[in-house]
Amino acid sequence: ISDANVATVTGSTTTIVGAGTTSVTVSQAADDNYNSATATMTLTVSQADITTATVASISDQTYTGSAITISPTVTFNGSTVTETTDYTVSFANNTNAGTASLTITGTGNFTGTKTVSFTIVKAAPTISFNDVSKTYGEVDFNLSATSSSTGVFSYTISDANVATVTGSTTTIVGAGTTSVTVTQAADTNYNSATATMTLTVSQADITTATVASISGQTYTGSAITISPTVTFNG
């Protein structure tokens, strides 16, 4: 066989090595009545259909925000074949959570295409929700969490004696410490998740309160006590 990249021969047993065309020469020794002689034929080995190859199952992939690429394990007749040499790989719908596809296209000894699917699962979002310190008497404020997800936030406060929340608007009720939990709904690419921070409300300084003017008192011979009118923030 003239091209060992196409086939090899041992005795008369021929082993196919790769797709292509080669000449095969047979030489026959002389006998009592005939001279020695040769003859040549052409051996053509066609490319194999890549659809008959096996692509190993692809495990679920987690959403990253970027296109996900995988080097698949491909076998043909029980032997592993090599990317670039035997096939190329392309992808579709391989960024967002859902069903993505991988297509192998035969090269070299293979022809045709084969497509398999794999799943991109939602990721856990990264939520930033920092502790907050306030002083009793401060005006309402908005809770503000940030996240890699676009899911809607909802907030709960564990101790209504410290603060209450409507939507994200938080009203201070009294001095103390409470935990605040944010829950974020799932979106297209992220699962739902929660995060917790601590809200600390310090006591207000009574010197900022207003004591109403006290009218003159008349001597009684006894200690005079008064219940003052004290206002804070109006």
How would you describe each model-predicted region?
Residues I1-G234:
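Solvent-exposed beta-strand/loop surfaces, strongest in extracytoplasmic domains of secreted
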